[in-house]
């Protein structure tokens, strides 16, 4: 027993700084970024800015660019040979063929749910007349979104030497596209049957729900040998929205991309939540005016933060950096400093602090007592002189 205690003490002193609340989950994905959509913060990342191949996740960009150039997604037209010309027959994932009566909606669902290269390529050819021109639109949109590590060469996502992106950039594209009503409806759909009734296909949402990811609202898969298994998704749990992008998972029949996402989602959904770290009216700091009046600096708002459930408010520190004494130059609303809320060395929140009062001239108590005393002495002296003068007259 004594030996065991010695060993435990040795371990404790050799490894004193291990964080028992460290994030932990098993994944094979090489690149990950998880956004909290409630506050647009990144809450987990792994090689998020590494330039990689992203496979069919780039069909998100193909689809949103197409939607923004289509007047009516229910418009019917016949597939023509040029819309499929040059596409490898193995890439005809949906099965669209020359002469088939389709709608833009069919092509969009085929692109996002079935991940059909024939859907993406046909959209590009129909809208721009050539894939090259359509890809120019995709790159223009990437530039508009401020994506500095993304460049497209084709519309369908097959690997090209000069085609690349990052999981972070894919997340930004997904966030942008999801704000479009048509895109959101399509990518959130379980399954779809084309307008001619020839094809029915399930999407990532249905697959995710079958695998136990019941919080999964929308998603797009991707795979090439170089990119590995990829997945971008949007989920929600307990009023918190998430956007997760994973890439480079080990290809297998075990759906490693979905398993990785489940492990990440489950960890954060079970161990993290939003809560107030300071409430409106809570005291930040007690300071004084030049005239010794006390001034209470208080929080102007509730501040909510997404934190590990094992971190409590008593573990947080409020640090004020600003004026400790206010002089007559200070008016209500003047900036007098800033404050931070910290957990260990991590800054959770930072805000400017403004004076709640206008400082007015006021005699300090000790000065006032001195003045009263002097006035009293002077008054008594004057009385003494008056009395003395009267006595002299009588004499």
Region annotations inferred by a language model:
Residues 2, 97, 101, 105, ...:
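Juxtamembrane/transmembrane-helix boundary motifs in multi-pass membrane proteins
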Residues 2-22, 369-388:
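Sec-dependent N-terminal signal peptides of Gram-positive bacterial secreted proteins and lipoproteins
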Residues 10, 17-19, 59, 108, ...:
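A generic alpha-helix preference that emphasizes hydrophobic side chains
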Residues 13, 23-25, 235, 329-330:
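Sterically constrained small-residue positions within well-ordered secondary structures
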Residues 16-21, 63-66, 283-285, 303-308:
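Intrinsically disordered, low-complexity boundary segments flanking structured domains
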Residues 22-181:
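Active-site-adjacent loops and short helices of periplasmic peptidoglycan-processing enzymes
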Residues 147-148, 159-164, 168-395:
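Domain-terminus/edge residues, biased toward the C-terminal soluble/receptor-binding domains
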């Amino acid at each position: 027993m004594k030996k065991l205690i010695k060993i435990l003490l040795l371990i404790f002193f050799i490894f004193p700084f291990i964080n028992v609340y460290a994030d932990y989950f098993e994944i094979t994905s090489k690149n990950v970024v998880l956004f909290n959509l409630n506050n647009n913060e990144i809450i987990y990342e792994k090689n998020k800015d590494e330039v990689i191949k992203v496979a069919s996740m780039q069909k998100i960009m193909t689809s949103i660019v197409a939607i923004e150039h289509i007047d009516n997604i229910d418009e019917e037209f016949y597939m023509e040979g040029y819309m499929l010309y040059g596409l490898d027959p193995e890439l005809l994932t949906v099965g669209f063929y020359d002469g088939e009566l389709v709608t833009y909606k069919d092509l969009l669902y085929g692109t996002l749910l079935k991940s059909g290269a024939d859907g993406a390529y046909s959209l590009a050819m129909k809208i721009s007349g050539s894939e090259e021109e359509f890809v120019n639109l995709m790159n223009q949109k990437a530039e508009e979104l401020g994506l500095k590590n993304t460049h497209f060469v084709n519309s369908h996502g097959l690997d090209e030497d000069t085609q690349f992106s990052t999981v972070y950039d894919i997340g930004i594209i997904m966030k942008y596209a999801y704000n479009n009503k048509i895109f959101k409806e399509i990518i959130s759909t379980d399954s779809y049957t084309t307008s001619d009734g020839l094809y029915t296909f399930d999407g990532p949402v249905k697959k995710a729900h079958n695998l136990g990811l019941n919080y999964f609202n929308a998603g797009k898969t991707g795979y090439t040998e170089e990119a590995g298994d990829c997945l971008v998704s949007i989920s929600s749990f307990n009023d918190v929205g998430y956007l997760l992008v994973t890439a480079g998972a080990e290809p297998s029949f075990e759906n490693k991309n979905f398993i990785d996402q489940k492990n990440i989602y489950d960890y954060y959904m079970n161990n993290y939540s939003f809560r107030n770290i300071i409430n409106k009216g809570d005291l930040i700091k007690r300071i004084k005016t030049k005239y010794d009046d006390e001034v209470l600096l208080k929080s102007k708002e509730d501040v909510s933060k997404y934190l590990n459930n094992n971190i409590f408010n008593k573990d947080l520190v409020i640090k004020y950096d600003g004026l400790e004494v206010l002089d007559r130059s200070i008016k209500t609303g003047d900036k007098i400093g800033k404050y931070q809320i910290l957990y260990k060395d991590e800054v959770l929140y930072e805000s400017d602090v403004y004076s709640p009062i206008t400082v007015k001239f006021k005699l300090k108590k000790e000065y006032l007592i001195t003045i009263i005393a002097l006035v009293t002495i002077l008054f008594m002296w004057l009385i003494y002189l008056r009395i003395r003068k009267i006595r002299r007259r009588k004499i």
